[in-house]
Amino acid sequence: MSHPPISPEERFAKVVKALLTNSKVTQSEKKGFGSSALTVNGRIFATLNHEGKLLVKLPKLRVDALVASGKGERFDPGRGRPMKEWATIEPVSGDLWLPLAREALNFVASKR
């Protein structure tokens, strides 16, 4: 018996729940990129955008690899200039959301 599909909001809530176990992670009350964002050291590393896609900050080469593999797209905030270190991940690739959010957490936490 198959389960009904999970909504992007429900999937992101699971990511949030898993990552909030890290004492350095908080969920912003502000709206970052269209929805409540996960932050570390006051910096956004993951959020759910207004299209229901996971938005994560990763190294440029990792974003390039996700784009090349068809698993992600560069995030364009609407100015026609995609951001080098931000990728969006479709809801159909939901099994990647938590691992990529963890990668984003580690990447942003390592930056000073």
Where are these regions (language model features)?
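Charge-dense, helix-prone N-terminal extensions
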Residues: 1-112
